Structures are given as C-alpha cells and as structure tokens.
Amino acid sequence: MLKIVSKPSFNRIALMGREGVEGVPETLAALKDYLVSLNREVILEENAAHMIDGSRLLTVPANDLKKKADLLIVVGGDGSLLNAAHIAVPQQLSVLGINRGRLGFLTDIPPNELTQISDILDGHYREEVRFLLEGTVEEGDEIVAQGIALNDIVLLPGNAPKMIEFDIFINDEFVCNQRADGLIITTPTGSTAYALSGGGPILHPQLNAMALVPMFPHTLSSRPIVVDAESQIKITISPENDVSPYVSNDGQERVSIKPGGNVYTRKYHYPLHLIHPTDYNYYDTLRRKLDWEKRAAKV
C-alpha cells in the first residue's frame, strides 16, 4: 500500500549506519548536523555512535529505538536497510533510507540532497507498507530456528556442490517434488534482488503475493510460481539427501537443516513502514536501477 500522508512532524530521529561502507560516517555526521539545525532531537543507534562525534546526543541500543524515536533514518545501501528493517519492524518504527550503496531500490535520498528530509519531517511524504516473511526451520517436533525476511527466505546447497531434493506444499496441498540447487521464496520487495538473478518475476510492491523461484532446477519445466501472500509454504527436505542444505533469511543468518526437516514460510504479522519523498515513483526507480533509461518512453 502506498499513500501520501500528511501528519504531525517527526521530531525524534534515530540514526543508523553500517560500518565499513564508504561515505557512511561523513553522511551520518552531515545528517546529524542538519537535523540539529532543524531543531530535531537526534538519537544515535549504538553502532552509529561509534562512527561520529555524538558526545552530546543520546545513544540507544538498536532494540530500544522505538522508546526514544518516531523515525529511523538509515545511511547505507539496500543491505543496510534490510538490517534496519529486522530491527525496526518488530518495534513498528518507520524507516527512511539515505543511499550510500550501489543500487538503492529501498534507499531513496542521495547524500547530496539531504534537504529533501525537511519536508518529510514536516509531515509531507509517501508511506509504503511492505510485508515481510517469517521462516521457521523444524526437525521433528523441534524448532531449530526462526527469523523474518524483507526480501527472501532461501534454501541453499550445503557445503558440497550437490543438488537438493525437496517437496513443496502450499496450504498443505502437495505441489511438486524438485531437484535443484535450491529455492527462493521472495516478497515483492525481494523480487528485484536475488530472485531476479534467478529468473524470477518482478512483483509490484503493492501486490499481496510472493514468488517461489527454483535455482538451477534439474527439470527444465520447473518455473517460478506466484502465490497469494496469505499462503503457508512448506518445504520438506527429502530424507534421501546425503548433505544438509542451509536456510537463509535475507542473507542475514544461515541455518543448517537435516534431511527430513521442514521449512515453513508465511507472512509476518508486522509490516515495514517505508517512508519516501512525495515525488517517489516505483517505475522511475526500476528504470534507473535496471538501466531501462535508454528505452524510456518519450512523453
């Protein structure tokens, strides 16, 4: 859902950035100074406090940001925003991205245009609600791991370069047996990330759908499937596998799953509230990031 919102201004702004990304400390420092000049209260997430001089500012652990802030601004690339989403979504804290990465599908504002933030803080912006996935790895009756993903839940080969055999069920109905290098279960947000390189479709962010994208399937007729996002997906790892594959959520964590285990994926109960400038246009972003500009229609 994308809507233009006019509401009371954001006054308490938390800043977050990823260490080791070029230009992030400089942009964080400039952003801090700009926000102070706008008479906003600035809160630093603990890692951000290590990158800039925040001696006069409140420093807060990532999991406590909602108690002190009403907006989280992330400086970095899409990977930085993914990391921030894992922190902000359970707290239901809105997120705005400043792009210091390469693609920037999720981080809208260039570092040399920080003045765009002023209108957003005054309550003039577009708010986009994007859903996440929740993945659960089970072996027998034991829950081995559980996590959320803004982009994707991915079944990956184990340490040996071998195909994985697995069964796919949707809402407890058997779909197919597959032998492939893995499977990507992607949200619309993730459809322009790893799943795109695997031949998956681009899903508009407002679609309440997810796609199942096989990775290098043994059968040429295996193709991506788009399903209702309210579905529950179950992947059962065949007991015949002689290696243990991995399950990853947004590339953040990787968990081994034994043959015979199950991976359950469903829609997470909290969404991401992503903030954009009022002139944000999804198709403009696609044209720029996927190099469609040369074929842009003349209006």
From Swiss-Prot:
Higher taxonomy: Bacteria, Pseudomonadati, Pseudomonadota, Gammaproteobacteria, Legionellales
Gene name of this polypeptide: nadK
EC number: 2.7.1.23
GO molecular function: ATP binding; metal ion binding; NAD binding; NAD+ kinase activity
Cytoplasm keyword on record: yes
PANTHER family: NAD KINASE (PTHR20275:SF0)
Enzyme class per UniProt: transferase
Record field: catalytic activity: NAD(+) + ATP = ADP + NADP(+) + H(+)
Protein's organism: Coxiella burnetii (strain RSA 331 / Henzerling II)
Subcellular location: Cytoplasm
GO biological process: NAD metabolic process; NADP biosynthetic process
Cofactor requirements of the protein: a divalent metal cation
Name of protein: NAD kinase
InterPro entries: ATP-NAD_kinase_N, ATP-NAD_kinase_PpnK-typ_C, NAD/diacylglycerol_kinase_sf, NADK
